[in-house]
Amino acid sequence: MRSQQSLEEIAELYGLLENIKKEYEDGIHSVLRKSNPELFSNPHTIPKLKKISINRGLGLAAQNTNILKKSITEFTRITGQKPLITRAKKAVAGFKIREEMELGLSSTLRGEKMYSFLTKLIFFTFAQIRDFRGLSVRSFDKAGNYTFSLKEQLIFPEIEYDDVDQVQGLSITLVLDSSTPKSRSKTVDRVLNGMILLKFLRFPLNDCGYYDKYESFGEITQVWDKKKHLRRKRWSQE
């Protein structure tokens, strides 16, 4: 039977989960439409979280049955669902990898489990990281998805110190779903949509760094286009 303290913690977590869902579903639409009605007049252009992908690479250690079983148990506790075992698509002799060899674990969260995991990350997990200074805004990809890594599993409340034989990290990707019009289909627009959503959800992103010195997003776009041109020029020379 659960103790009164654990029941109170569960109730508190559920309350935070409901708050963050309600804030997103009821709040972000009105906030974005008021701040910029031209860009977000269509509700389909408002950024939303589609899924969270969590991965762990084990390498050749996955051939050890005990290590694989412990990793599956940890993943199940952390994510709330049993992970899929990722396998090698083709053999690589130099790395001693055979085709269909077990190499890691992967889990995809949607709906209620996605919001539950996100709430746990924001309110509990990040607070356990020593000297945590926030996450870099440079970890967005061209589609506006955000990927970051956690170095150890001990920062999650479900993992007990005595149960861990080997410290292993996780790679987490927040996949966004936003339909941008043709006028805002550039990479910088997708990244800005991702930043808007994660900031609204109180995700601990660092400030924009050197982007602060630019007066408008148009200047930032020019810098990005210039970098692309230099990159293409370097590739053509090679």
Curated annotation (Swiss-Prot):
Keywords: Chloroplast, Plastid, Ribonucleoprotein, Ribosomal protein, RNA-binding, rRNA-binding. GO terms for biological process: translation. Its main location: plastid. It is found in: Plastid, Chloroplast. GO terms for cellular component: chloroplast; cytosolic large ribosomal subunit. The keyword Plastid applies. InterPro entries: Ribosomal_uL5, Ribosomal_uL5_bac-type, Ribosomal_uL5_C, Ribosomal_uL5_dom_sf, Ribosomal_uL5_N. Pfam families: Ribosomal_L5, Ribosomal_L5_C. One of its GO terms (molecular function) is RNA binding. Part of the 50S ribosomal subunit; contacts the 5S rRNA. Binds 5S rRNA, forms part of the central protuberance of the 50S subunit. Belongs to the universal ribosomal protein uL5 family. This is Large ribosomal subunit protein uL5c. It comes from Thalassiosira pseudonana. The lineage of its organism: Eukaryota, Sar, Stramenopiles, Ochrophyta, Bacillariophyta. The gene is rpl5.
